[in-house]
């Protein structure tokens, strides 16, 4: 790992104290200045957001997320991948399930290649490669300046190795999940161990102008992050990562059982809801397959 300088990022607004967990979470309000590093110049003049198809998880088991099958309209998960193109550079947010799954029957492809019982399994369906979708809009892996994951779970890091030349933007907690002393080796992102890496703290302004901000929303993982993109025409959006899995999470305030007791996910959701109210941003849940099917996909884009 080539470690770049560590930024201490000034968080927006107040700090909420999680007394039960002894942790701090920053509440986000627009208006403060963030540290950011110099970026390369891209060919576009404005900000663009491309939505790519990173595959589908076929599942009928929302109980793991605190919901029943009767409560969820569509239990399958889309695995969205996002390319943000800014005049100062490019950022890829999440990388999908993995191009290696293209052409494999979904009923023979359990999530994470784990042979789980069919009644509770998630199965993988990938019909197009992320690489080909990027090439269709003129971007090879070598043209991606920065890489960030909402978190390093299998459905978000499947193509990570293809972007090892990019600078990895990550919090220490998630980096330790990937490469720390107790980490389980995962070949899907093994190449990132030698990538340029920026350990970020709190919220992070990627390009230095407030238009693309990684929001620290821990809980699902220690370093989980969501992404704010201030689109001039479409309006601002927040890409949720796995802070929410289903749209019903919003309606019923549900979450995985393991995330309830510490209170960290709850605090991150409160932080994000305050941020949405302040900015008027739309919330995009990357696993919401019904919403994903209605979105514009690359080569179309939001700006």
Question: Positions of the model-derived regions?
Answer:
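Conserved G/P- and acidic residue-centered "switch" motifs that form tight phosphate/ATP-binding loops
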Residues: 94, 151, 220
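Hydrophobic membrane-insertion alpha-helices, especially the h-region
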Residues: 22-30
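Metallo-beta-lactamase
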Residues: 9, 13, 17-18, 31-155, 162, 167, 187-196, 202-207, 211-218, ...
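Short glycine/proline- and charge-enriched loop/turn segments
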Residues: 108-117, 250-257, 302-303
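Metal-dependent catalytic neighborhoods of phosphoester/phosphodiester hydrolases
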Residues: 158-164, 294-297
